[in-house]
Structures are given as structure tokens and as C-alpha cells.
Amino acid sequence: KIFNKNETIGSMKIFGEKNFYLMNIWSSWCIPCREEHKFLVKLKDEKNLKIIGLNYKDKKENAKKFLKDFSNPYSLIFLDKSGTIAIEWGAYGVPETFLIHKKKIIKKFVGPLNQESLIEIQKIIK
């Protein structure tokens, strides 16, 4: 939906103080990313949660097709063609997801989100 070129996801300045943010590192070629995507779509309508995507080592065209085929839960998407931004966040692969509140990481999910992590996120943001 929105591929942001002007801001950097490397700093916390894009995250506001009020909402919770879910920063999801994903790729169109990642099979576990496809498996977790339905859980991101379920979280998309949570009032005080914004989902931000970091597209990892992917082609923009492939990422757009993935989102067209599977739906777009992201309010913002950043491109990380080289993978260096993900490394700066402490991610070692895809998918990885960070729950952020008041500009601090409060939970890190390594691997695909599932029903259990969906329930955990919903409890935290209520």
C-alpha cells in the first residue's frame, strides 16, 4: 500500500507515544511469512495497533504482488533490500516481529506469528 522512502525505520521517531506498533519483518519469498500473514490481517483492525512492515531482501514488485494476493495489513512499509536495517533491529531472518509501545520494544517474536502470539498481542494492547 505505502512504500515509504522518506523516513528511516532505523530510528524510533516514526513510532508515536500513544499507539502500540507491530513491526513485522517479512519477504514475499518466505514461506513462514505466508503462514503468519493471516494473523497480521486479523490484527489490522485493532484500534490502538498500527502494523508496520519491513520488507526484507525482496523486490518491490514481488512484495506488491504478495500483498495483492494475500491482503495488506500494513499502514507503512519500508524496503530493506540489503537486509542491513533488519540486522540493526537485531533480526536474524524472516519473519520476526517486534511489539513497540512508547518507543520501546516490549516483545520480540522470532519466527511466524501464530494463534498463541495473536492472543498474546491482543491481551497486551487492550
Region roles according to the model:
Residues 37, 41, 60-67, 118-122:
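Extracytoplasmic/secreted envelope proteins and their assembly/folding machinery
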